[in-house]
A protein has these predicted regions:
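Canonical positions in the second alpha-helix
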Residues: 37-38, 70-71, 105-106, 144-145, ...
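Canonical tetratricopeptide repeat
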Residues: 6, 50, 84, 124, ...
Length: 266
């Protein structure tokens, strides 16, 4: 069984390296056949895990998930095997809450408190929590990640955590995080537009307008800024100006402008 497993493993590694021309019959199919022969002789969990990895590489996600689920009930279940199952279920468009549950099992098996080595799992679960509409839990995962890596994070981290905070209606936290992202990367207009969005959500329309005007000074073709400007003006009962900006946003290809024109502009 060991020989079959090792041949299968070699072929899998070879195919993963994306060879120009396949050597003899070193394909995923042959790798799978070898690993399944090993399983027939002795169904060791490590063989089943290899079977899952090959099926995953072949994009047979249902088969891969079945293999990973077997491994997860065995004595070699680990953070990595539960992570594989969670990612596979996500690719199968499974229930987002079930994906999070698999990620919970992954993280529960990590050394506690979580160290920097295992911290990427927290980022993955944060994203999965967002997909499952559990923004507060996502925010807590980002907090735990920040602790695990001792605050060694970049602007993208603050942008993602801000989005979780905003969705969780933690507006002050959202404002603080987006300000931090901008401080670390002042030229990224996405962050500035997001800063305007948070201000708009908390009713600070004048602040939002000022931010948006600054964006348009830098890039007069930034369609989203015109749409957001229009939304601020609607709140300030300046419908004509707002409609002009929605129209401008539409001309610049903003996909959300049409709906606003229908709603507010005769």
């Amino acid at each position: 069984d060991d020989v079959y497993y090792n041949i299968g493993k070699l072929m899998y590694a070879y195919q993963l390296s994306k060879p120009e021309k396949t050597y003899k019959d070193w394909t995923y199919d042959t790798a799978l056949k070898n690993v399944r022969q090993a399983i027939a002789i002795d169904p060791l969990p490590i063989y089943t895990q290899m079977e899952g990895d090959i099926l995953f590489a072949q994009q047979d996600y249902a088969g891969a998930l079945a293999a990973y689920e077997k491994v997860n009930t065995s004595n070699i279940a680990s953070p990595a095997t539960f992570f594989s199952a969670a990612k596979t279920k996500e690719l199968l468009k499974g229930d987002p809450k079930e994906v999070v549950a698999l990620m919970d099992s992954c993280i529960a098996r990590c050394p506690q408190p979580i160290t920097a080595d295992f911290a990427p799992y927290l980022l993955e679960r944060a994203q999965m929590n967002m997909n499952a509409d559990q923004a507060r839990n996502a925010m807590l995962d980002y907090d735990a990640y920040h602790t695990a890596v001792k605050g060694e994070v970049n602007d993208v981290f603050y942008y993602y955590r801000e989005q979780a905070a905003l969705k969780a209606r933690q507006f002050q936290r959202a404002l603080d995080d987006i300000a931090k992202a901008i401080e670390m990367n002042p030229t990224d207009l996405t962050y500035q537009a997001e800063h305007a969005v948070v201000n708009l959500r908390v009713g600070r329309y004048e602040e939002a307008i000022q931010i948006l005007n600054n964006i348009l000074k830098t890039d007069p073709k930034y369609g989203e800024a015109y749409r957001l400007l229009g939304l601020c003006q609607i709140q300030l009962k300046k419908t004509d100006e707002a409609c002009g900006n929605f129209k401008k946003a539409k001309e610049l290809g903003d996909p959300n402008a049409d709906e606003l024109i229908t709603k507010y502009c005769k």
